[in-house]
Amino acid sequence: MKRRQKRKHLENEESQETAEKGGGMSKSQEDALQPGSTRVAKGWSQGVGEVTSTSEYCSCVSSSRKLIHSGIQRIHRDSPQPQSPLAQVQERGETPPRSQHVSLSSYSSYKTCVSSLCVNKEERGMKIYYMQVQMNKGVAVSWETEETLESLEKQPRMEEVTLSEVVRVGTPPSDVSTRNLLSDSEPSGEEKEHEERTESDSLPGSPTVEDTPRAKTPDWLVTMENGFRCMACCRVFTTMEALQEHVQFGIREGFSCHVFHLTMAQLTGNMESESTQDEQEEENGNEKEEEEKPEAKEEEGQPTEEDLGLRRSWSQCPGCVFHSPKDRNS
């Protein structure tokens, strides 16, 4: 009986020890697992924080990009967008031209602008420079003179007149050659053949030749007393209208003074502008001098500090006594 009791007691103790050991192990495992779990939780929380921060950054960047994009779209909507010439043509319902025509459109527009500027310059009026002279046996003997500022000697007086009519020379001289201009003024081949036939038909002894009037003598061979001499070619014309016609359509005669009068007008205009600028500068300089004069007078009237110091030193000198005129008389 005693042995059985001892065995039960020992079994109970062993079971308690094993239970205690198992409980210790479970506690140690729980203790070991608790910091790991906290670490895992901490790591997971850190991961969640990083994810949230990155999501916030991406959302901020995307929102800023959206704001910038929306602002650019508003600017484009507010500002009028220039349309290309092809789009304008398509809106009008016309067929767009070929690429060659589009490439040449800029050059043609530039050329038209230049030609219009030339025409507008000439439409303002052209100046003709001439001299009134007196003739004697076809030679200019005397003319009006004037005194210039540069020299005391009298020089020929040059006058100018502006054409009331619009002067249209045509295309610029760079585009048209003199041969084409001369060929336009010369008679054509058919006219020459017609003239040759009429000359061959008429005999030298026939009465038709005798009845025909003689060729008209040119104006520059007619003797005159007074006239208008062109400053370019020195030819004398009887009337101002003849001089104007000579300047405008002188190319028909093979020589034109048109360019001379244009350059002369340009040079005189430049000289006048320079003279006006010089006069304005002189007037401004005189005004500045007049303003500076009263200031200088005021400065001269006021005594300087050096003069006051000298006067005080002389008056305060003990060896020098200044007497009034009353003291001197006494």
Swiss-Prot record:
Residues 275-293 have a biased composition (Acidic residues). The N-terminus is necessary for nuclear localization. The C-terminus is necessary for transcriptional activity. Expressed strongly in testis and brain and weakly in prostate, spleen, pancreas and uterus. Belongs to the FAM170 family. Transmembrane segments: none annotated. Keywords: Activator, DNA-binding, Metal-binding, Nucleus, Phosphoprotein, Transcription, Transcription regulation, Zinc, Zinc-finger. GO terms for biological process: fertilization; positive regulation of DNA-templated transcription; transcription by RNA polymerase II. Coiled coil: none annotated. Acts as a nuclear transcription factor that positively regulates the expression of heat shock genes. Binds to heat shock promoter elements (HSE). The modification Phosphoserine is found at S315. Residues 1-54, 76-104, 169-218, 270-330 are annotated as: Disordered. A zinc finger (C2H2-type) spans 228-252. GO terms for cellular component: nucleus. It comes from the Eukaryota. It is found in: Nucleus. This is Protein FAM170A. Residues 189-200 have a biased composition (Basic and acidic residues). One of its GO terms (molecular function) is DNA binding. Pfam families: Spt46 (PF17734). Residues 174-185 have a biased composition (Polar residues). PANTHER family: PROTEIN FAM170A (PTHR33517:SF3), PROTEIN FAM170B-RELATED (PTHR33517).
